[in-house]
Amino acid sequence: MSNLNYDFSIVGGGIVGLATAYKLQIKYPNLKILVLEKESKLAQHQTGRNSGVLHSGLYYKPNSLKANNCVKGREQLVNYAIENNINHDVCGKIVVAVNEVQCDYLNKLKINGEKNSLSGLQILNKKEFQSIEPYADGVSALWVPQSGIINYEEVTNSLAKNIVSVNKKSKILTKCKLLNYSNQNLQTNRGDFFSKHIIFCGGLFSDRLASSEVKSLDLQIVGFRGDYFKLKNSAKHMVKNLIYPVPNPKFPFLGVHFTRMINGDIECGPNAVFTFKREGYKKTDFNLKDTLQALSFSGTRKLFINNWKFGLNEY
């Protein structure tokens, strides 16, 4: 039975779950840690389905938790990548303004970034930013040298490897679905486990996991899918690194951007469209429970009423 007893159990095998487990294992090397992931491989959802960008912390409110986590997290991630020979590139990005109104917002972004400890930010004229991205067009651009690219699935798998190298008694279990839990007991399709502490890092199902503990939880995850286009090989030369638009301050999205992936591909995206299945990645994916729960939530209705025109354009 001792093999089924753990000090910490992490539910969720994305980068948040593995980073949490790794930090705990490094700080407390003698503790036994268990990571449970329902898929056959780690990092198969949000972690492995994004632009792969090392974000600088440019946009977030100064001194906020989000800003501090982004800046410190990026620095730690780059150091981890260097120490563990993970392919990455701190290549910088440009945020391009296409009119004078956006130029004013660009200056505000620069000030905001500097308050978040970003150095080397520069407002560039057209000639200057086209020396970085020759095919970009606009009035001016903000150069952000701290931005970069990485493969987060690779990072996640590296974290998993390092956890078990620190403590051979720790385990990373895939194809392991949580069926039920109470107090310190976890029931899964791969057996039952006892854990002194349980940490949920359940991604798109975090609210459902939390609601079983916090009955009065008034928050809910509403799923949005992002679609990407991949540039043809003949067009790859048109994007050197990262090209972003000036974001619309009314919405929590950075806008459709061009990204050089760490494998050399160039992607354009994402948009943001309501999805009828939480972990649905195709336009036709549908789950009745997910859909009804999202549409019955007052926050979803408010979002749709206030932003229906923007939403239609995303399709």
Identify the residue ranges that each predicted region occupies.
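Helical element adjacent to the flavin cofactor pocket in flavoenzyme catalytic cores
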Residues: 142-197, 201-208
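Flavin-dependent oxidoreductases
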Residues: 19, 181, 188-286
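Glycine-rich FAD pyrophosphate-binding loop
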Residues: 25-48
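Dinucleotide-binding Rossmann-like beta1-alpha1 core, especially the glycine-rich loop
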Residues: 52-128, 138, 255-256, 265, ...
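Glycine-rich active-site loop/strand segments that organize a redox cofactor
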Residues: 43-73, 83-88, 128, 275-313
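Conserved Rossmann-like nucleotide-cofactor binding loop
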Residues: 16, 41, 205
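Gly/Ala-rich phosphate-binding loop of Rossmann-like dinucleotide-binding domains
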Residues: 21, 25, 162
